[in-house]
């Protein structure tokens, strides 16, 4: 993967091709660092502890199908965790304190289908945030949708979250 760089909102939009107006900076005005190697289907996010945003990236190649990765908000004080949907709606999950979870969402035709996203074969994985900095690596697989019909399984070989 390439060298990680601090990027602003416009640069992130150029990388992902998606509207990221809902992306908010943390207290110091910096944005999440992102490095994408689409050819290898690698997605790499680096966030600071005080970042309170969600970032999504489409990894499904079909034009009429988009599968999204949602990065949850982390709250260290009180030990609570929430998953923030693309729409900005908070979807609270019952998770252990100081945990990390990955959520998969489906979206097509510019609208999120919550009914289908609820039925997606989620691979929710929790990790304890024990030490900092830390790196969490895992693989993801999800069922795609084409014209409302389930299609082949889409795999991401590696997704890495690095907290520093």
Model-derived regions: residue spans:
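N-terminal export/targeting and maturation segments
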Residues: 1-78, 148-164
